[in-house]
């Protein structure tokens, strides 16, 4: 059982894997029909990951909650051995239909699975990517621990999530009293502060290497579209300084090798 905020109050909703999966299948189909480009590789969170991921040829990369597979295809075109995992069969069906014509250097694998219980062996991947996903999971800590488990020692995590402590986040909190709380009508949504997420990342055993942010938006009046200052996203130094105001937060972390973890545990 999970509690969500909807409208002006709390509403209790009972979820199990099948009911939530069914809702996400419907959501993906509706979003795809309304906007086929939704969540494509030009989304700001994928742009952040692309900026930091570095050379990936030959690397084993997992994208958790890959959706319709746009970023999976981009990574595979760059020479990575990519696995995409998503909870929704509808999203994976859409992803599979686009793979044959994608011109991939290496085949990509698509697997249905739960981000909170990843169906992969330990130490399977060099890099794990998760974009705008953990805020839609009932158990975020289990998901972060699972991403750590399937990453090899020395491997990296690149993760993005909305920043609810900025101007737009405050505006969204205000809007809770006027509209349902779900972002894009997603079936499940939790608003968590980035410092808490960083704490969970560290507790799972990751070493944080870098944080950043993107999409600086400033609401003017309720009901009006916010102004986005794209110039603030173009320079990394400026973006870093203003990251507390960003709409999307980014963290890159590394799984400690076993020797380093053993020394740390002995202290």
Q: Where do the protein language model's features map onto the residues?
A:
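Intrinsic disorder/low-complexity segments
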Residues: 260-263, 267
